[in-house]
Swiss-Prot record:
Name by which UniProt lists this protein: Small ribosomal subunit protein uS19c
Homology family: Belongs to the universal ribosomal protein uS19 family.
Organism classification: Eukaryota, Viridiplantae, Streptophyta, Embryophyta, Tracheophyta
Annotated organism of origin: Aethionema cordifolium
Subcellular location, record wording: Plastid, Chloroplast
A GO biological-process term: translation
Length: 92
């Protein structure tokens, strides 16, 4: 279910402050965050945000097509390595 339009999108306050500070300085640097639940808003476009996936921070460059999505969607937490090969020797 989607979020109600009466409510504003959730963005962590510390993340919003960092982005606004960089926008006023017109600087570009990597912003490290653990807030995977924050929604991407238009002021974030052009910044690189390092999103925590549970083990490390993955840098993600924000483009206009990402607006409205959550940060956690772009940092996968599970690394699927494929199913085990069919080994007939172990079945005997």
């Amino acid at each position: 279910m989607t979020r109600s339009l009466k409510k504003n999108p959730f963005v962590a306050k510390h993340l919003l402050r960092k982005i606004e500070k960089l926008n006023t300085k017109a600087e570009k640097e990597i912003i490290i965050t653990w807030s995977r639940a924050s929604t991407i808003i238009p002021t974030m476009i052009g910044h690189t945000i390092a999103i925590h996936n549970g083990r490390e921070h993955l840098p993600v460059y924000i483009i206009d097509l990402m607006v409205g999505h959550k940060l956690g969607e772009f940092a996968p937490t599970i690394n699927f390595r494929g199913h085990a090969k069919n080994d007939n020797r172990s079945r005997r």
